[in-house]
UniProtKB/Swiss-Prot annotation:
UniProt name for this protein: Probable transaldolase
EC number, as in UniProt: 2.2.1.2
Protein role: Transaldolase is important for the balance of metabolites in the pentose-phosphate pathway.
One GO BP: carbohydrate metabolic process
Active site, renumbered: 83
Localization in the cell: Cytoplasm
Length: 214
């Protein structure tokens, strides 16, 4: 399973990349706003750090505007993936960009049927949001299993990016189900590496080492 980092914080991206954990990056308008920097400036810097897919989201809500934005974004770097909303206009734009050979990531997916529609329109990636479903007492990971089954049944090419990851269990469940990608906040990436018994073991080794005659 591939790990994308879900952030527009260049410092976090550099640190995660140094750990060997980053196969790609997902950004969105909210994450860019948190950075306090110009959109294009941030995206360009990220492409210089990570050699993998970089999802950059359009702001327009209608087809022609989406295509105009996508065309400009795609010029930034060959690794740019255009992030589009799961709407009828977004699906139309997905189909248009597919025909032009531009990769897409259809986002804000909350049902298996939305994922299937996006895949049929030619999406490179589909991004179901598990944490937000959990927030309203729905089974976020359940739809990942359903999407995986549907895509396998029909040989769909689109890759499943599990998004809105809140904790390490989301990542574990995604791996067990067979999702293609998890896009993970840096804080959760760090949690994946931690265990109290690891810390206790290191402490014990160091304590024992102090007893070795010098």
């Amino acid at each position: 399973m591939k790990f994308f980092i879900d952030t527009a914080d260049v410092k976090e991206i550099r640190e995660a990349n140094e750990l060997g954990l980053v196969d790609g990056v997902t950004t969105n308008p909210s994450l860019i706003a948190k950075s306090g920097r110009r959109f294009e400036e941030v995206i360009k810097e990220i492409t210089g750090i990570v050699d993998g897919p970089i999802s950059a989201e359009v702001i327009s809500l209608e087809h022609d505007g989406m295509i105009a934005e996508a065309t400009e974004l795609a010029k930034i770097h060959p690794n740019i993936v255009i992030k589009l909303p799961m709407t009828p206009e977004g699906l139309k734009a997905t189909k248009t960009l597919y025909k032009r050979g531009i990769k897409t990531n259809v986002t804000l997916i909350f049902t298996p049927m939305q994922a299937l529609l996006a895949a049929k329109a030619g999406a490179t990636y589909v991004s179901p949001f598990v944490g937000r479903l959990d927030d309203i007492s729905q089974n976020g990971m359940g739809i990942i299993q359903e999407i995986r089954t549907i895509f396998d049944n029909y040989g769909m090419d689109a890759e499943i990016i599990v998004a809105s990851i809140r904790n390490p269990i989301h990542v574990l469940d995604s791996a067990l189900i067979g999702a293609d990608v998890c896009t993970i906040p840096y804080s959760v990436m760090l949690q994946l590496a931690k265990h109290p018994l690891t810390d206790a073991g290191i402490k014990k080794f160091l304590e024992d080492w102090e007893k070795v005659p010098k």
